Amino acid sequence: MKRLLIAVSLLFWNATIAVAAEPNAMKLHDAPQPLPSLAFTDEEGTPLTLEAWRGKVVLLNIWATWCGTCRREMPTLDRLQAELGSDRFEVVALSIDRAGVGVVREFFDEIEIRNLKIFIDESGKAARDLQVFCLPTTILVSPDGMELGRLIGPAEWDTPEMIEFFGA
């Protein structure tokens, strides 16, 4: 029964994505792709994986404070989370800063990020496992943890088109 529910949910999600246009060069896959197991921590150092968001659509943004385009797009991700963040959708901004959570907290405070939580992978292993070669890279993850699409480079995440795409 659980497998049937997941299959129906995935079909519904794929149908929704097919109706909405691909925004800002988000490349959607023909079929969902498996993701490697990722390990990272939150601001308090609590270990996490993407399993923490099972059942939600996740917009996983891999970024760093030293990346200029990442810094410029972060407020738009914050506004997208403010607009759509719910029990069905979450923006997960995963920093790969080796300097640690302090530089991320300082940056979030500096630009008044209020809706995103801090997640960090100081080792950079998550980015390597995801084959992220350019920052920022943003991955659309299905409620069952599969990669639906990927955008390499920055985007304006809070445009009406993006809100419609993710809110559909």
Where in this protein do the model-derived segments appear?
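Loop/turn elements at helix/coil->beta-strand transitions in domains of secreted/extracellular proteins
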Residues: 55-57, 87-90, 115
